[in-house]
């Protein structure tokens, strides 16, 4: 349960972004930004197992993507904090800035606030409840269809690091077990070859030494 991605944009022009994990965030976000009207507004778009929350103020869009079980109030608290910090830092410069002009500086702010609002659960319960009521007043939830340029339905694909780590550990463990099994198999085969060779040599040499006890070859 976390905030997965955050972006600040002017219309469809991305000014700063940060992703918590891998995924096709930009491809999906570009479709979302193109559908957001320029007037001041707050809205949530559900899409599959994820929610897209945004605040639009003075043509600047503050947007984040969360799991569908992440509290909307926490998402909008995050967006409000990002909006306040961005406006304080850049002011009217955002209205004419080039794409990614603020990314080198503000992406670290997005990362820090994303982590803080995803993990912080120590708020006073009364204040938290009141903040939820106040924050969600007038914020609608509206369905949205995302269509890629090729005309196919666009889906958000998330590549969370934990899954990759688990797969890597499983692969390494399987490889190690396979190598151990092959080593034991080779060892058994080597022992069998040695035993067969000894028996074969014994059978060949025995007639030359006068029998199976080798009486003519063993000195008494």
Curated annotation (Swiss-Prot):
PANTHER family: SNARE PROTEINS, VESICLE-ASSOCIATED MEMBRANE PROTEIN 7. The modification Phosphoserine is found at residues 167-168. It comes from Pongo abelii. Disulfide bonds: none annotated. Coiled coil: none annotated. This is Vesicle-associated membrane protein 7. Involved in the targeting and/or fusion of transport vesicles to their target membrane during transport of proteins from the early endosome to the lysosome. Required for heterotypic fusion of late endosomes with lysosomes and homotypic lysosomal fusion. Required for calcium regulated lysosomal exocytosis. Involved in the export of chylomicrons from the endoplasmic reticulum to the cis Golgi. Required for exocytosis of mediators during eosinophil and neutrophil degranulation, and target cell killing by natural killer cells. Residues 2-188 are cytoplasmic.
């Amino acid at each position: 349960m976390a905030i997965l991605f955050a972006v600040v944009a002017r219309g469809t022009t991305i000014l700063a972004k940060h992703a918590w994990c891998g995924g096709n965030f930009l491809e999906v976000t570009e479709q979302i930004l193109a559908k957001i009207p320029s007037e001041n507004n707050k809205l949530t778009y559900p899409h599959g197992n994820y929610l897209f929350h945004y605040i639009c103020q003075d043509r600047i869009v503050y947007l984040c993507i969360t799991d569908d079980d992440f509290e909307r109030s926490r998402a909008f608290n995050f967006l409000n904090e990002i909006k306040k910090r961005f406006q304080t830092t850049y002011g009217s410069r955002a209205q004419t800035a080039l794409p990614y002009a603020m990314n080198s500086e503000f992406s670290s702010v997005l990362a820090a606030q994303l982590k803080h609002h995803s993990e912080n659960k120590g708020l006073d319960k009364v204040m938290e409840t009141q903040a939820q009521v106040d924050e969600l007043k007038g914020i609608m939830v509206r369905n949205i269809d995302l269509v890629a340029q090729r005309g196919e339905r666009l889906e958000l694909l998330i590549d969370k690091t934990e899954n990759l780590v688990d797969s890597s550990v499983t692969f390494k463990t399987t490889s190690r077990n396979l190598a151990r099994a092959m080593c034991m198999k080779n060892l058994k085969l080597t022992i069998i070859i040695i035993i067969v060779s000894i028996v074969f040599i014994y059978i060949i040499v025995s007639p030359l030494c006068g029998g199976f006890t080798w009486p003519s070859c063993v000195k008494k």
